[in-house]
Amino acid sequence: MSQILPSQDELLAHAAAEPAFAAWLQGHGPLQHSAETRAAVFRTAHQLVQAGLQPDLASVYQLFRALDRLTASALRIVVHMTYARRIRLDGQPLQAEDFKTQPEGHTGGALNMVPAYAGYLALNVLTGKTRAWLMGQGHCVAAIDALNVLTGNLHPEQERAYADGEEGLNRLLQDFYGYAQAPNGAPAAPLGSHVNPHTAGGIAEGGYLGFAELQYAHMPLPGETLVAFLSDGAAEEQRGSDWIPRWWRAEDCGVALPVMIANGRRIEQRTELGTHEGLEGFKLHLRRCGFDPISFDGRDPAAFVCTLWEMEQRLERRVQEKNSGILRYPLPIPYGIAETVKGFGFYGAGSNAAHNLPLPGNPHNDEQARQLFNQHANELWVEPEALELARRLFAEQRGERPLERDNPLALRHPIEPIIPPLRYRDDACSPMAALDRFYTELVEANPDLRARVGNPDELASNRLGGVLKALKHRVSEPESELESVSGRVITALNEEAVVSACLANQGGLNLVASYEAFCVKMLGAVRQTLIFARQQKEVGRPAGWLGWPLVATSHTWENGKNQQSHQDTTFCEALLGEMSDMVRVLFPADHNSALALLPTIYRSRGQLACLVIPKRDRPMVFDAVQAERLARDGAILVEERCGSDPLLLIANGSYQLEQMRRAAQRLAEAGQAYRLVYLQEPGRFRAPRDRWEVEAVADEALVERLFPDSHERRVLLTHMRAEVARGHLWPILPDARRTSVLGYRNRGGTLDEAGMQFANRACWGNVLAACARLMEVPRTALLTPEEAAAVAGKGDPALLR
């Protein structure tokens, strides 16, 4: 900690005058305080008293002493969670039968997180302010659970299970990797291997390393503070995390305090930051990116308290200097680096084994391992009376302050947005124009909801010029009228970084638009958010953030300007595999059908939408009434020719509807009865997989009205791969022998729309060939001989344009 600090002589004199400081200096077991940390605690204590946050120095030092005891106890609980079925609060050694037959845990990382999270809790107590927290390494959740139990920071279900002293702790140990299941197959215990909705104050699972680094700066709103615990292993994961100083603005961002746990090891080997040269190089890299790195002792919870406090003060001073004209954006963002060793506080620290199971054997059946466990756990033991005193001190100083469980980021529920008027059109235009105007007016009508647009550098090309003109690229030095220091468009050629800006902005209005093929790079970040929100719903505390669309445009069927890398339907297919009550996968066919979807998307809570929208001009198909019915029902009857043995034609996608209508015209000329339905929301017509998804699917009456059982022969032309669509939509494609599904067949290249359709056997001619097969008539009953030859790959494709 590069600060002006007192000398060693001053500290010794202070210890003689302040018995509470002298008592804290003793540390506890492996928790010992370096000269630098001692000086930092002295300085912090005086600042807290001078700021009126604490009555006197003795009160501060007493809490630091309690912090050591809570930290040691939590370290002891964490190693018990990995290895033991019971804990002895009296400090007696465990016997063979007290240990698990199959120990499991991410022990080393969790041990490293104990002083970090304990320091965060202590800072909240000392300052009377509840900050939020985020942990990128979600597998270290044992540290969080242990300290939450010790401090009484629990959701009701965890309080019932784990709060009653030694018995509760024993249940905690037994539930941790206990694999117990409820009758419905869900985990039976209110506990997990990663951060989950049972984790008090948790806001992200932290299962995908690297995404916390991309998201933390976009999470807090002005007036809020977030402490983000990050992994040194994840520093290898995401370049976008280096750009945080580019995006942070005091005017619309809360305080974000990143702290890297630099333990020097990943699972199988040391990290680059595990070397002195690597760590120094990383600090230099941070400075070049606009950060203000602060190294400190990551083994000591007191060092976390002092560093977090110092980071807050530094950022506040930087903002004041910016307001005074001394600095300009980007401001130096304080970045804590907690230097430690993997698994500090227990046997095996610093080894590869520390990651999972640090002991050389299982204490359940290995005498040496049992002795090592008892020896090292005993060094962490705190007398019950001293532990109870520490817990009581933390509780008493909380006062009326909200529990960390109830921090503002964990309770996100922004106001209902004002929806602008819907401006339907009757001319051919880009469906993206509906989104462009609606979102611009939505943001203008809701100034209290922070707007964020995620843009991988194609906003204008993707027909969102109005959004760009109104909201502007966020930059430090504007070079055009489309850029601004306060811009709300986060632009980077990094899909994960820009989608993370919106996933993190749970207090506002969001929009992400990208080429469909490149949206695939967003899947991990999106899926982590969807999973966490679904689990929140399942435990009875549903997410309150406002829904928003992930727009996949310049899509597969209209991106023939580029090669096949730009032609990929994976994104919508993958999201269709997620739960339909959490993400809607939508294929509007025209401007009006796109526009009619937007109010329900932005009014929803804890739900995303994948909008696959053409950017090129498309003819108007649906008027306002039809578009709103389509938005409500998920599918709509487009046209019908009555008669015997009718075919059921189903189009899914704008270009697919165009081809289906051409095929239907030829059927009409042949006197064949048919019914043409446009399928905008496939997930509405799947078989529900659980009781929550039941609420998202169409009822039987609607299904029968749109897809009547009397129409047995069915042809689906889909935007997606045919196999994916058939799998999800088996309820409306019940008989494989009497149905045909056409779609993307992984064919492409530099082709126009008609060329893409022909290459994938998904044009109107292929539809008619499928109809002929189901009708058991030759293709030439519906196609000319020349057209039939083209469909068979033996003629001129131009005939089918």
Residue ranges and their predicted role:
Residues M1-A51:
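Intrinsically disordered, low-structural-confidence terminal and linker regions
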Residues D98-V114, W133-C140, A186-E205, S231-A235, ...:
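Active-site nucleophile and cofactor-binding loops and adjacent substrate-binding regions
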Residues L154-L169, W248-V259, R288, E477, ...:
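A glycine-rich helix N-cap at a beta->alpha junction
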Residues E213-V227, Q506-L523, V677-Q680, P778-R779:
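Glycine-rich phosphate/pyrophosphate-binding loops
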Residues R370-A428, C771-V777, E786-K794:
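N-terminal leader/propeptide and maturation segments of large enzyme subunits in energy/redox metabolism
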